[in-house]
């Protein structure tokens, strides 16, 4: 016969939420760092279109 599940404790719930929030904060920090790198012009790890290239494509 089926028996009801035990309730998850508040400590376990808080521990899981803290882990999730820590991961989200880490990813947000990475995204912010990458954005700053792109805006400062120091990034050379990937290619993205610049305004000069976009204007040149329209004339062709």
Curated annotation (Swiss-Prot):
Top-level taxon: Bacteria
A GO term, aspect molecular function: structural constituent of ribosome
Annotated spans, Disordered: 1-60
Key words, A-Z: Ribonucleoprotein, Ribosomal protein
Gene3D superfamilies: Single helix bin
Keyword Transferase: no
One GO term of the biological process aspect: translation
UniProt GO cellular component terms: large ribosomal subunit
Composition-biased stretches (Basic residues): 1-23
Sequence similarity: Belongs to the bacterial ribosomal protein bL32 family.
Protein name: Large ribosomal subunit protein bL32
Organism: Microcystis aeruginosa (strain NIES-843 / IAM M-2473)
Organism lineage: Bacteria, Bacillati, Cyanobacteriota, Cyanophyceae, Oscillatoriophycideae
